[in-house]
Amino acid sequence: MRALLLKGGRVIDPASKRNEVADVLVEDGVIRAVGANLAADGAEIYDAAGKVVVPGLIDMHTHFREPGQEAKEDFASGSRAAAAGGYTTIATMPNTRPVVDTAALVTSLQKRAEEAAVMHIRIIGAVTKNQEGKELAELGDMVEAGAVAFSDDGHFDPSAKVLLSAYDYLAPFDKAIINHEEDTSLVEEGAMNEGHRSAMLGIKGRPIVAEDIAVARDIMLAEYAGAHVHVAHISSARAVQLVREAKARGVHVTTEVTPHHLTMTEDCVDPTDSSTKVNPPLRTEKDIAAMLAGLLDGTIDMVVTDHSPHAREEKDREYIYAPSGFPGLETALGVLMTELVHTGKLPLETLIERMTYAPARIFHLDAGTLREGAPADVTVIDPDCVWTVDEKKFYTRGSHSPFVGRELRGKAVLTVVDGNIVMKDGVITI
């Protein structure tokens, strides 16, 4: 393997608190050195001057649809979309067909990922069998097989009794349960945030209290069991405060937020364009302000995409009948740089920490740092690259993004996985 020398970029490594202009030398798949005026005979030189060199981005909440719905996305297409967006590690949710609820499936999917993906894919196992909320899945066996966390994402079916049993079982393993926080009984058939906007559009709403109730319940159960609850795609101001208060009293609770929940409100909903239909739904400016404050003060630990591609014919249905979600891996960094970093709302260093070191630390991944000896997963960002989102250039099989046509500023221009360049200037190279 040829050595790679990244010269003269601004190196941001939250794990070591490094934020300075430096060189990064990659040899034999690891970070060999970080410092000034590095040299290596025969190394490939990449001029990173004016760019930002960071640990490879990590996304702990994606839906790659494999097995069972490969027409929407599979490990090959999804991993290429991830690499194009600057990601070197992602975790994929278990709501597939069949549901990932056995050790055998975890093992087979890990093997499949090694064969088909251009970056690292980690597997999240289901909490309950077939995600039906009735009987615990093979949790211990899936831990042994390598499941990185557990989730019935997309469902809020487990009763308090079943969920408490899962917390009790997983607490000794220090594995998180990632919960989709909406009380199903309150959001059935709802397609957007409940409020004045939904009433004006004539679209049945999903009340925000459904999220608040769910977050409160799951925090209390995790606190009782001494277990780790991870609140998925938080979107409510009250939920942010509940997490903040729980952390203050020592509860093992972490949480995530998506770029769309940080930058879009219910006012973006257009009944003729289902790309904005997501669960939980887009909320209000008040909620965005609370989430941004939570991101700044550490209440919200990480940013994820909830990358959820669907077939075009599915998303072209009437708003209330279209499935929820859209692809986000190729637009996330640009949206966050444009809307938060370049507007002065969020320091770049904080954003990088929430997209690299934090998820690696919380989910115990050997990733998220540029320390010497670490796996050479590196992303180079051009903070001033101005580009227009074009679905025809997506690597994902889903094209239904609300950001299509948007001009963004900031983009990953180089993605390195285990020392190999897998993306350069938007082109997958392997």
Predicted regions and their residues:
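Histidine/acidic residue-rich metal-binding segments in metalloenzymes
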Residues: 134-303
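Active-site mouth loops of central-metabolism enzymes
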Residues: 60-73, 96, 122-135, 204-208
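A glycine-rich helix N-cap at a beta->alpha junction
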Residues: 112-126
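Divalent metal-coordination and catalytic microenvironments
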Residues: 9, 24, 29, 50, ...
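C-terminal cap of metal-dependent C-N hydrolases
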Residues: 318-321, 375-430
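Metal-associated gating/positioning segment near the N- to mid-region
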Residues: 48-115
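Histidine-rich, glycine-flanked metal-binding segment
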Residues: 1-56
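His/Asp/Glu-enriched, well-ordered alpha-helical/loop segment
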Residues: 200-228, 275, 296-297, 301-302, ...
